[in-house]
Amino acid sequence: LEVGTGSGYNAALLSQLVRRVVSLEIVPELAARARNLLRCGGFDNVEVILADGSLGWPSASPYDAIVVTAGAPVIPATLKEQLRPGGRLVIPVGDLALQQLIVVQRTEEGFQTETHGGCRFVPLQGKYGWQ
């Protein structure tokens, strides 16, 4: 699962590594443009969905991996819960100026979290984003 389709570039890269990519975009114009670009590029294993990515996409869960390409104020529990055991969530978390890149792995016992340094992403929009 990718949260934040944007231009579709990351979804195109991910599509070369995995069988199927579900990518969520909250901005209608970006979703339509990315959908068109990906189709024209022959990336048939990418599905772009207009949705609030901070909620994830439960109907296609559980996921092996979730990549969030926008900075969040907190890690949305909704995304963690959609991970398969052994799955990983990569998400930038912090304030609007600076985030830390967080990797969450779901285990049989719960969740393990690692922090991997500073980064800066556009703000996550939606219910669990910056609104």
Model-derived segments and spans:
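Conserved nucleotide-cofactor-binding alpha/beta core module
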Residues: 1-112
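Conserved histidine-centered catalytic loops in small-molecule metabolism enzymes
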Residues: 113-126
